[in-house]
């Protein structure tokens, strides 16, 4: 953990005290993002989930959607757990940790990453698309993709599959036709192969520089729920602007707590306002 994140973690207790003192028992709704979790990191992730469960309730994607749509009340601080990209470790985590705890997660899958069988091609795809700053020969050996069998297992055990484009492209760099293909062709593949209807979509990368108005408009025509990488609370929110907090298994519980108490939310206010302006432009 870098120095800034270590320092930031010390704000957890003051922020928690302030929130409890000034906002009382007003419930909060937040979404977590994880990516690959290696076997060496599994115990850390398990400890994070155990710690979070003491103060937060984990919702299923269906419960989360019902709250976002105003059909169910938000009664207490709640979390939705999401995983991005479609790494094979996600199935292992579901089997070993989530399923025994009856925690249901939302897995955003890059459809072009599914069913790559050659290890070299898999590493090349990760380097070219998911982590473009990482050379293919530096991709960790454990970074592999789920296939359709793995995704079917997740569905069978009560989890939800979401769309994450065809190739994990930075949508802001594409024209409308290319954006349409990335979003819709990728989703069509997953729906056809898995026999499901996909309602949830997450932007690749998730930052404001990777998104534009065209990608928002095209995604809105296909999906009810659209997820960003902007940190923030979701208790009163449009379903096309869902905030998420990204974490790693080696993050301390106090760093996680600081973010969930809203320690970085103000940083994203201007970004979120800019994103909302796109929806208002006719």
What is each model feature region?
Residues 48-55, 97-101, 157:
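A short, Lys/Arg-enriched amphipathic alpha-helix followed by its capping loop at the start of a domain
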Residues 85-92, 97:
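Short acidic, Gly/Ser-rich segments with clustered Asp/Glu that frequently serve as metal-coordination loops
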Residues 32, 76-79, 99-209, 236, ...:
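Metal-dependent polysaccharide deacetylase catalytic core of the NodB/CE4 family, i.e.
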Residues 1-82, 88-89, 173-176, 180-282:
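C-terminal active-site subregion of NodB/CE4 polysaccharide deacetylases
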